[in-house]
A protein has these predicted regions:
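Extracytoplasmic thiol/disulfide redox context detector
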Residues: 2-5, 10-96, 170, 174, ...
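C-terminal cap of thioredoxin/glutaredoxin-like
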Residues: 3-5, 30, 60, 144-215
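Short N-terminal micro-motifs specific to bacterial/archaeal maturation
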Residues: 20, 46-49, 109, 130, ...
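Solvent-exposed, acidic/flexible segments
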Residues: 51-52, 66-70, 95-102, 111-115, ...
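Sec/Tat-exported extracytoplasmic proteins
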Residues: 62, 73, 78-81, 109-113, ...
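Extracytoplasmic/secreted envelope proteins and their assembly/folding machinery
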Residues: 71-78, 82, 102-106, 119, ...
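Structural microenvironment flanking redox-active thiols in thiol-disulfide oxidoreductases
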Residues: 80-111, 116-143
Length: 215
């Protein structure tokens, strides 16, 4: 099982490191200096767009730390950066013995324009309501909750498309060597395992500050 830790614990570790060392790490991306604790993946292409930062969260619906980060940590970042931050989740299973139903539901909802809503509903159902989502009746409740038609949703779910999208995301995570969830990828090639909001804010601010020198 991949190791995981909550962002609150990471925050304490991050602040201690910053106090001792000034900045945990710096790197050059183009001409812009990035600050914080991160790894630039040289084999991956940057997807950066001026004035925007793309945040990809590799997460397991059954991971409690992923649930906490998605509900608390991500909210802090969205409040800090507003429409300058584009966040999306990629399903990456690390908890053994779980069927891929939750991930397939998320992928199908994305194709119908309700990915973020379904993500929140699935996380809540698993971690707060403590209800499994294998049963079709439970799925129908969630599908209606996010404003989708159950018949159309189930038809799409039965096709190969959601499963393929989930598998493509898993392969992406394997390629960039995800070791724990949640792990964040910024702008396609900046990998962040220390996912406390303070470290992520430091990195994202430095990306945005460097836009004037980016080619």
């Amino acid at each position: 099982m991949a190791k995981r830790r909550g962002w609150r614990g990471s925050l304490l570790m991050g602040l201690m490191a910053v106090a001792a060392l000034g900045f945990v790490g710096t790197a050059q991306a183009g001409k812009a200096e990035l600050k914080g604790n991160f790894q630039v993946l040289s084999d991956e292409k940057s997807t950066h767009k001026p004035g925007k930062v793309q945040l990809t969260e590799f997460a397991d619906f059954y991971c409690p730390h992923c649930h906490r980060f998605d509900g608390e940590g991500l909210a802090i970042l969205e409040k800090e950066f507003g429409n300058k931050l584009e966040a999306v989740m990629v399903g990456y299973p690390v908890i053994p013995g779980k069927l891929p139903t939750a991930f397939d539901m998320y992928e199908q909802a994305k194709t119908m324009g309700k990915g973020a809503e379904m993500k929140r509903a699935v996380f809540r159902t698993i971690h707060k309501d403590k209800i499994g989502i294998i049963d079709k009746a439970i799925r129908e409740v969630l599908i209606r909750e996010v404003g989708l038609d159950p018949a159309a949703f189930e038809e799409g779910l039965a096709s190969a498309k959601p499963a393929k999208a989930f598998e493509d995301g898993r392969k992406w995570g394997d390629r960039i060597k995800i070791q724990q969830t949640p792990t964040v990828l910024l702008d396609g090639n900046i990998k962040v395992e220390q996912i406390d909001p303070e470290n992520l804010k430091l990195i994202i601010h430095s990306i945005l500050d460097g836009d004037g020198t980016r080619k």
